[in-house]
Amino acid sequence: MKKLDRIIVALDQMSLDEIDQFLKLKDNNLPFVKIGLELFVKYGPDLVHKIHREYQKKIFLDLKLHDIPITVERSIASLKNLPIDFLTVHLGGGVPMLKAAVDEARISIPDCKILGVSFLTSLEASDLESLYGITNTDEAFLRLFKAASLSGVDGIVSSPHEVALLKKHFPKLLSVTPGIRFQDEIDSTKVQDQKRVMDPAEALKSGSDFLVMGRSLTKTSRFSERMKSLQE
């Protein structure tokens, strides 16, 4: 797989016009985009169909479903025949919920992979301890990864710092990693919304299968330069 094929660009905090302008950029040959909760609530399935039809992009629908099993099952059923490649659910929903998600996805969106979200990249170790009493983060992540494996989930969404742990114990699970920023952004302390971050080259070396990048690509005035660096 080419390096650019492993980059998923998050279309977060963008208007329809901004999305169109970005996807029409001359050097934008990124094949995969992410539509998050905000955009999906605002524009619904029409946005998914539009991007798939007009730009032939693969689509990661990042809804992070987390509810009782029947509600998650019916929510996925409502996505029937939507042209999506990835869909997220929260691993914290437990094995019954995860199995319900996987089973319904095989029926309603059979070409879509179900990804389990571990802990949000906006949380760091101190947050996990204060919220959940977690003092051993590796053990906490492994419990979630095990639930994913038992449930038939296709992959894991986690920060790049957990990828080595995932691949060591569950190598067959895909690793999709947000929290990816260019090194100069990390060095300049411009990263505020995510705490467990890494640059693209390092994340790929750690074993990530797909990298999720947002404003580093969508809000930059150096897009062509950034694209070249991703291909090096």
Report residues per predicted region.
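Generic structural signal for well-ordered alpha-helices
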Residues: 19-23, 48-49, 76, 95-102, ...
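Conserved anion-binding
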Residues: 3-7, 67, 71-75, 80-155, ...
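Conserved, mostly hydrophobic/aromatic
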Residues: 9, 33, 64, 87, ...
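Glycine- and other small-residue-rich loops at beta-strand/loop junctions that grip anionic moieties
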Residues: 11-12, 36-40, 68, 89-90, ...
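Glycine-rich phosphate-binding active-site loops on the catalytic face of alpha/beta enzymes
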Residues: 82-94, 193-226
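Structural motif
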Residues: 28, 54, 82, 151, ...
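Conserved alpha/beta-domain cores
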Residues: 11-55, 69-72, 165-167
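Short, acidic/polar
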Residues: 13-25, 70-78, 137-147, 194-202
